[in-house]
Amino acid sequence: QADMSLRLGGGALRNQQDGLIFSQAGALEVQAGSLDNRQGTLQAQGDNRLRIGGALDNQGGRLDSRAGNLDLQSGSLDNGAGGVLNSAKGWLKLVTGLFDNSAGVTQAQSLEIRAGQGVRNQQGHLSALGGDNRIVTADFDNQGGGLYASGLLSLDGQRFLNQGAAAGQGGKVGAGRIDFSLAGALANRFGQLESESELHL
């Protein structure tokens, strides 16, 4: 097993425009002040662990773990414009400020997300394919987006915006069980919230 480690301290890592950093047999660990991975790929066969002090820009890029877990910490994370965060067989943990997943895909067997400045998931897809999806944040904007869990979907936040301008344009929420704890409003005009069993709002 050959692991790969990149430690740049407070420096910037630029891997944009079809850049590829790939740990073919083991884990990948990256520590940097910022990461520009627009249209780039950071991939590991094992665990993929990123510690980014500032902004992580993954617009149109891919952060991937094939057989391990995806463990992300950053000041902010922009996964918009077709960005992909994927842990095919393991969990994904994210600790960040603002998490922008607009028109992006974030998926793993289970998800744990802490985004202190909010989550934007407009037209995005955020899914726990085999287990729970646990989110702690401020406002969560899911207008036109999809938020899913095979098991429990737990959201602790301020407002949840799931509305649309017309039928079929609202957000979609689906899970085995849903447990929302909101300090603010839930807007669901033309939106869908579906639970296979329990639904707590």
Predicted regions and their residues:
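Short, T/G/N/S-enriched strand-turn elements that build extracellular solenoid repeat scaffolds
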Residues: 1, 16-22, 37-43, 58-64, ...
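Surface-exposed loop/turn motifs in large extracellular/passenger domains
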Residues: 1-12, 24-33, 44-53, 65-75, ...
